[in-house]
Curated annotation (Swiss-Prot):
<dbReference type="GO" id="GO:0043527">
    <property type="term" value="C:tRNA methyltransferase complex"/>
</dbReference>
<feature type="binding site">
    <location>
        <position position="116"/>
    </location>
    <ligand>
        <name>substrate</name>
    </ligand>
</feature>
<comment type="function">
    <text>Catalyzes the formation of N(7)-methylguanine at position 46 (m7G46) in tRNA.</text>
</comment>
<dbReference type="Pfam" id="PF02390">
    <property type="entry name" value="Methyltransf_4"/>
</dbReference>
<keyword id="KW-0489">Methyltransferase</keyword>
<comment type="similarity">
    <text>Belongs to the class I-like SAM-binding methyltransferase superfamily. TrmB family.</text>
</comment>
<protein>
    <recommendedName>
        <fullName>tRNA (guanine-N(7)-)-methyltransferase</fullName>
        <ecNumber>2.1.1.33</ecNumber>
    </recommendedName>
</protein>
<feature type="active site">
    <location>
        <position position="112"/>
    </location>
</feature>
<feature type="binding site">
    <location>
        <begin position="188"/>
        <end position="191"/>
    </location>
    <ligand>
        <name>substrate</name>
    </ligand>
</feature>
<feature type="binding site">
    <location>
        <position position="112"/>
    </location>
    <ligand>
        <name>S-adenosyl-L-methionine</name>
    </ligand>
</feature>
<feature type="binding site">
    <location>
        <position position="148"/>
    </location>
    <ligand>
        <name>substrate</name>
    </ligand>
</feature>
<dbReference type="InterPro" id="IPR003358">
    <property type="entry name" value="tRNA_(Gua-N-7)_MeTrfase_Trmb"/>
</dbReference>
<feature type="binding site">
    <location>
        <position position="36"/>
    </location>
    <ligand>
        <name>S-adenosyl-L-methionine</name>
    </ligand>
</feature>
<feature type="binding site">
    <location>
        <position position="90"/>
    </location>
    <ligand>
        <name>S-adenosyl-L-methionine</name>
    </ligand>
</feature>
<feature type="binding site">
    <location>
        <position position="61"/>
    </location>
    <ligand>
        <name>S-adenosyl-L-methionine</name>
    </ligand>
</feature>
<keyword id="KW-0819">tRNA processing</keyword>
<keyword id="KW-0949">S-adenosyl-L-methionine</keyword>
């Protein structure tokens, strides 16, 4: 379904306590900074924030209209988190606004698989993205990656084989909801839909090396 863009979406959220301009991200002080790249409408992010009040969560979304929808959704929560911000930013720009070794964990949930070969570099698990994430993560920082797409999952495994100096796989499953990992899993809205259709969810957890 094509997204209906909202005019002046970012203007509407400028005064929200849950919105951050990218330039403000480097001022966040937290021993446990968690970042979700492509936070969508913020269900997963807000659940994480509520369940982990001692951590700080930042949602990255490049489409202003989705940023607006995400913040509106947080505003409708009965219990509103105080440890959450959402910003409008492309994943390629993360290293411009976040300090090196400042992030404890990165979540990549159901990213666009970009199936065409000419779009390989747009995949969030492409080598240049993993290199950026390695730079941003603290020592032994983590990446949690979930997808319903078999091809993207296999692509990611192939990339990791070629970049073994950067990350090691500490959790891996091709059927998350029939694995022990489901006990601590928080589902995204996409994930709920996929599971209801019987789609198997793939997951990797990566730990930073060096």
């Amino acid at each position: 379904m094509r997204l209906r863009k909202v005019k002046d979406a970012l203007v509407r959220v400028q005064d929200s306590p849950y919105f951050s301009n990218p330039e403000q991200l480097s001022t966040i002080e937290s021993e446990s900074l968690f970042v979700e790249i492509g936070c969508g409408k913020s269900w997963f992010l807000s659940q994480q924030a509520q369940q982990n009040p001692k951590c700080f969560f930042v949602g990255i979304e490049r489409e202003p209209t989705i940023v607006l929808k995400a913040i509106n959704k947080v505003n409708r929560l009965e219990v509103k988190p105080r440890n959450l911000l959402i910003t409008c930013l492309d994943a390629n720009q993360l290293t411009e606004y976040l300090k090196p070794q400042s992030i404890s964990k990165i979540f990549i949930n159901f990213p666009d698989p970009w199936p065409k070969k000419r779009h390989t570099l747009r995949r969030l698990t492409a080598p240049h993205f993993l290199k950026q994430f390695h730079q941003l993560l603290k020592k032994q920082g983590l990446i949690e990656f979930k997808t319903d797409n078999d091809q993207l999952f296999e692509f990611t495994l192939e990339v990791l084989q070629k970049t073994v100096a950067h990350f090691k796989i500490i959790e891996q499953t091709t059927d998350l909801h029939n694995s022990p990992l489901t006990s601590t899993n928080i589902m995204t809205e996409y994930e709920q839909r996929f599971v209801s259709l019987g789609v198997k969810i793939k997951k990797l957890t990566l730990e930073k090396l060096n």
